[in-house]
Amino acid sequence: GKDNYPWIHIPVGYFKTMHNPKTDWCYKTEPDESMNNISIRYPRGKTLGGSSSINGLLYIRGQHRDYDIWRQLGNTGWGWDDVLPYFIKAENQERGKDEFHGVGGPLSVSDQRIHLPLLDEFQNAAEEFGIPKTKDFNTGDNHGCGYFQVTEKDGFRCSTAVGYLNPVSYTHLRAHETNQ
């Protein structure tokens, strides 16, 4: 469906969009013997913008080495050095442009606005156990503990619908909505 349901655009709204038949396909996994035959909910977006309209807004890229393994397995063009320019081009990073981030792209990426003393203490405790603090999980090395960035701008979600589809108005282009 359309992305005009108000809870889609408010970051805390994912509590109202996940497991909601209006915005989520409400899939479940098959029961698994290793988990006492229970199935797990598997939220998938049922709206323009797909799952980027109902998720927790986390912006975390994969590990450098994982992309390079994909390339080594024969997936030409999928190594870290191949995909990084596209990550940079896609971003509108509030921290500004650097070797890993871009500005001016359709996807708004920002720091979380709320920092909790408990989470700050958790980071300190992790550091005591050898897990480094990090301020950026998108450099290709996700090892560490810290606050992740989110796909949000000015307090509103930046889904693929908001970032890529809504800004474009082509008379010859239509997004087909379906109930399946």
Identify the role of each PLM range.
Residues 1-2, 144:
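Glycine-centered small-residue hotspots that permit tight backbone geometry or close packing
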Residues 2-43:
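N-terminal FAD cofactor-binding segment of flavoenzymes
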Residues 19, 34, 101, 168-169:
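A generic structural signal for short, solvent-exposed coil/turn residues
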Residues 21-26, 75, 136-137, 162-163:
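Short, surface-exposed, polar/charged, turn-prone segments marking secondary-structure boundaries
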Residues 36-155:
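Rossmann-like flavin
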Residues 157-161:
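A conditional alpha-helix N-cap/helix-loop micro-motif detector
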Residues 162-170:
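N-terminal Rossmann-like dinucleotide/flavin-binding domain of flavoprotein oxidoreductases
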Residues 172-180:
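Single conserved hydrophobic/aromatic residue that forms the stacking wall/gate
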